[in-house]
């Protein structure tokens, strides 16, 4: 079992534009949070192996298994917002699943960005995110132009 998990996650790397954007946001004092669905041990291991743990406050990681609320239940998002001390209008949720990520976030009034890079085909396109991005370079540009963040180009 250990060998299986080691092999499964050994090749897990973030896309080349993820870490630079997260570092820029972190350096700018922007709170970076994660809302993820799955077993706590597996999701925590993914975050660790992706090398992102130094950029995310552990108190801003919300794993459905640990909280006891699954996506797409908006209560999972409400819990995250409350614990982070944010109103929905102060948050931008980036997700790759229109039904499980974007719809619940939008229902609460959060800003949303649908990442199409790893999105599975056949999603309910009647659900419309505020922004559609192909990669995190596009997300950075959106953060600069729409939300006025002073971020470097990468």
Ranges and model annotations:
Residues 1-17:
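Metal-dependent phosphoesterase signature
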